[in-house]
Amino acid sequence: MRVIASSIRKGNVIEQDGKLYVVVSAENIHPGKGTPVSQIEMRRISDGVKISERYKTTDQVEKATIEERNFTFLYEDGDGYHFMNPETYDQVQVSKDVVGDAAAYLQPDMTVKLSTHDVNVVSLALPQRVTLEVVETEPVTKGQTASSSYKPAVLSNGIRTTVPPHIAVGTRIVVMTEDGSYSERAKD
């Protein structure tokens, strides 16, 4: 399907020169003089090579037809990550290149969205928030509960983040998967 370049967003899949690219970032630039352009950074799905392209905002770009489905994460082995379709119980293996940094947040039985083109998995979308346990942080300081300062912490998946002073080791917290930031204390 052909669309204008200015409508391309992060996560879209573009077909160019017979190859598929997933959009890493897309920005529309309107200079004071001259024609507005769309600056698009893409990662080639087949081998992970990153490229950057500039299009006039009115140029036509071939947007690939992508099918999104919910899958359940099962396990990881040396070959990649294994997911199951909860409706058909079909299993699919996804390479480490496609999963990328999202691997740190994957937990058994977690539901994720896998985007496929033909039969190939091209991208993975995590839930917005995950619950993790704090495994290392400074001790709780009495009297600092209303402070807006944060202290460093290491989570059960190895990610480093900052948490409020009242959070102690062993506390389960909700973390945003997009940037690894603290959201709230878990309610479970």
Curated annotation (Swiss-Prot):
Secreted among keywords: no
Domain of life of the native organism: Bacteria
GO BP annotations listed: peptide biosynthetic process
Example of a GO cellular component annotation carried by this entry: cytoplasm
CDD domains: S1_EF-P_repeat_1, S1_EF-P_repeat_2
InterPro entries: Elong-fact-P_C, NA-bd_OB-fold, Rib_uL2_dom2, Transl_elong_fac_P/YeiP, Transl_elong_KOW-like, Transl_elong_P/YeiP_cen, Transl_elong_P/YeiP_CS, Transl_elongation_fac_P
Claim: tRNA processing is one of the keywords in the record: no
Keywords: Cytoplasm, Elongation factor, Protein biosynthesis
Localization per record: Cytoplasm
Disulfide bonds: none
GO MF annotations in UniProt: translation elongation factor activity
Annotated pathway: Protein biosynthesis; polypeptide chain elongation
Database matches in Pfam families: EFP (PF01132), EFP_N (PF08207), Elong-fact-P_C (PF09285)
HAMAP family, sorted: EF_P
Cited function: Involved in peptide bond synthesis. Stimulates efficient translation and peptide-bond synthesis on native or reconstituted 70S ribosomes in vitro. Probably functions indirectly by altering the affinity of the ribosome for aminoacyl-tRNA, thus increasing their reactivity as acceptors for peptidyl transferase.
Family statement drawn from the similarity comment of this UniProt entry: Belongs to the elongation factor P family.
Protein name: Elongation factor P
Gene: efp
